């Protein structure tokens, strides 16, 4: 009996092509990263010295502990902001809801270091808000640099991930589930924690992992405002480009630790979601209701204040782009001079950016 020859149709070729690209641009770099972490500088021989050096000196392993501390705190703060915001926007009528959702999405549309730079302009040593409060009221603002500043910038930048994912999950919750809980005597708070939260917990954990990975791997924000608080990405960069004593193999070892930590958390998240996952189709989706009294005021203040803080970096960037400059300093007055310079000197960069996006 003759063996049947494999048939290569269009979709088989596409699948092979996708797998080849996946292997070339993802699997191969990761394997190279791990292999380089076990090589000795100069000889290329196998060694554990890179990891021994990292865990043997507080100067290095402290950056890993700092990264974990910052990332965990940012993830928790993002959950504490994003989940309540998603609940409020899904269950209650908030004035300007469509505009608020657009602004939340816009707040995600710039690199993290842009937000850090904007907050430096506001709350830095010579920031607008810092100088105003100091000169007018004699109030000394806490420093934007270090752990606190990074926690602020990362949280305001990354909580929209939580909000968007949890909002999507809440749209699949059938109102009959909430009505059943109310008929059994559950008050509003108990209904949230015993009915609503268990339904969206797998989604919240998945979005929290995205926040964790974004914060863990970010370099720009710690480089700008991480003064006195070393984290692993900046240590890796300094080690890789350092002109005095830097080692690409040692940098690879540190980077591989980040990959391992993220991979372990991803596997734990997948295990939990698979264990707790379920499918729900909302025959009657939740219809927002209008809150009354102080409750309504508090929810509006919370939502508006949060959105304002989220878009402040973008407003600051627009404001500073319109200010006049001489050499590299701001002077009184406003103009479109900066935009003119963009088309004279940076047009190719804009074209390249658009080209890469497309």
Please tell me what each predicted stretch does:
Residues 57, 92-95, 171-176, 186-188, ...:
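Juxtamembrane helix-boundary/capping and inter-helix hinge elements in multi-pass membrane proteins
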Residues 184-186, 198:
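Glycine/proline-centered hinge or cleavage motifs at structural transition points of membrane proteins
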Residues 237-261:
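Helix-loop-helix hairpin linking two adjacent transmembrane segments in secondary transporters
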């Amino acid at each position: 009996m003759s063996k049947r020859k494999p048939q290569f149709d269009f979709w088989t070729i596409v699948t092979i092509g996708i797998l080849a690209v996946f292997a070339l641009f993802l699997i191969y770099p990761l394997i190279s990263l791990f292999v380089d972490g076990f090589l000795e500088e100069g000889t290329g021989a196998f060694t554990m010295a890179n990891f021994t050096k990292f865990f043997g000196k507080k100067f290095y392993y402290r950056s890993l502990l700092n990264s974990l501390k910052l990332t965990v705190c940012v993830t928790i703060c993002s959950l504490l902001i994003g989940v309540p915001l998603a609940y409020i926007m899904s269950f209650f009528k908030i004035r300007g809801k469509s505009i608020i959702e657009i602004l939340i999405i816009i707040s995600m549309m710039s690199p993290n270091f842009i937000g850090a730079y904007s907050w430096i302009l506001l709350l830095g040593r010579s920031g607008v808000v810092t100088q105003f409060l100091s000169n007018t009221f004699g109030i000394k603002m806490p420093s934007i640099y270090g752990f606190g500043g990074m926690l602020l910038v990362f949280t305001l930048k990354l909580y929209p991930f939580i909000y968007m994912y949890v909002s999507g999950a809440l749209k699949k919750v059938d109102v009959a589930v909430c009505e059943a809980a109310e008929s059994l005597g559950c008050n509003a708070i108990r209904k949230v924690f015993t009915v609503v939260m268990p339904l969206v917990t797998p989604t919240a954990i998945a979005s929290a992992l995205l926040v964790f990975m974004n914060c863990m791997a970010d370099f720009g924000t710690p480089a700008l405002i991480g003064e006195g608080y070393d984290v692993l990405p900046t240590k890796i960069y300094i080690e890789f480009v350092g002109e005095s004593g830097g080692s690409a193999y040692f940098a690879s070892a540190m980077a591989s630790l980040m990959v391992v930590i993220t991979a372990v958390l991803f596997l734990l998240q997948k295990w939990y979601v698979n264990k707790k996952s379920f499918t729900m189709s909302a025959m009657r989706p939740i219809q927002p209701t209008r809150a009354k009294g102080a409750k309504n005021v508090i929810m509006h203040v919370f939502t508006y204040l949060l959105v304002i803080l989220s878009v402040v970096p973008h407003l600051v960037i627009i404001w500073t782009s319109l200010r006049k400059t001489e050499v590299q300093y701001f002077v009184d007055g406003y103009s479109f001079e900066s935009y003119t310079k963009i088309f004279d000197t940076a047009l190719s960069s804009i074209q390249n950016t658009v080209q890469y996006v497309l």
